[in-house]
From Swiss-Prot:
Residues 1-19 form the signal peptide. GO terms for molecular function: antigen binding. It comes from the Eukaryota. It is found in: Secreted; Cell membrane. One of its GO terms (cellular component) is plasma membrane. GO terms for biological process: immune response; immunoglobulin mediated immune response. This is Immunoglobulin heavy variable 3-11. Residues 45-52 are annotated as: Complementarity-determining-1. Immunoglobulins are composed of two identical heavy chains and two identical light chains; disulfide-linked.
């Protein structure tokens, strides 16, 4: 019985910590092929400047696809081949914010975009 109570207590602690981290995306919309959009992600509940950050996406009926990541100091970025040369990831550590500038958009870029720590 003691083990069961300890397990429930541990789960509650872990869930409580996870719930403090918040990432809120904005900036999506409808755009014609060839157009541009800028996504933003407002982070809270952790020291944003300590973490690499990523953008991932999920196209309708498909799995998650990694798009890009950026180092904590912005000194290093990397992109999926499918978006290289068209998308630019950036961040503002003073504002706890992550961005994704998307240019030359294509039909295949249609997806739900998420920022991730």
């Amino acid at each position: 019985m003691e083990f069961g109570l300890s397990w429930v207590f541990l789960v509650a602690i872990i869930k409580g910590v996870q719930c403090q981290v918040q990432l809120v995306e904005s900036g999506g919309g409808l755009v014609k092929p060839g157009g541009s959009l800028r996504l933003s992600c407002a982070a809270s509940g952790f020291t944003f400047s300590d973490y690499y950050m990523s953008w991932i996406r999920q196209a309708p009926g498909k799995g998650l696809e990694w798009v890009s990541y950026i180092s904590s100091s912005s000194s290093y970025t990397n992109y999926a081949d499918s978006v290289k040369g068209r998308f630019t990831i950036s961040r503002d550590n003073a504002k706890n914010s992550l961005y994704l500038q998307m240019n030359s958009l294509r039909a295949e870029d249609t997806a739900v975009y998420y920022c991730a720590r």
